[in-house]
């Protein structure tokens, strides 16, 4: 039986800051080239058409266009950017 009460308030009182991961642009939204679309750790979402992947797995738009979040098969997601047609 312990003779001291187990108190860990000074050792346990720390937490890491949030990394603000996740989608930064919505499906159907217009983006410019270089815009960050999705911040992530690993490839939770894969790069599709006109989307690049940074060194920290961040997905970004390579061209101006409309964002589309798509499914690749049953368990994989991808984000693409499609150019806006010039018919007006």
From Swiss-Prot:
Q: Does the record's keyword annotation contain Nucleus? A: no
Chain segments carrying region Disordered: 1-20
Extract the InterPro entries matched here.
Ribosomal_bL27, Ribosomal_bL27_CS
Q: Name one GO biological process term.
A: translation
Q: Which Pfam families match?
A: Ribosomal_L27
- Its Gene Ontology molecular function terms? structural constituent of ribosome
Looking at the UniProt record for this protein, which Gene Ontology cellular component terms does it annotate, in alphabetical order? cytosolic large ribosomal subunit
Q: Which PROSITE patterns match?
A: RIBOSOMAL_L27
Q: What disulfide bonds does the UniProt entry report for this chain?
A: none
Keyword annotations from UniProtKB, A to Z:
Ribonucleoprotein, Ribosomal protein
SUPFAM superfamilies this protein is in?
Ribosomal L27 protein-like (SSF110324)
UniProt family annotation: Belongs to the bacterial ribosomal protein bL27 family.
- What this protein is called in its record is Large ribosomal subunit protein bL27
Say which species the protein is native to.
Geobacillus stearothermophilus (Bacillus stearothermophilus)
Q: What is the lineage of its organism?
A: Bacteria, Bacillati, Bacillota, Bacilli, Bacillales
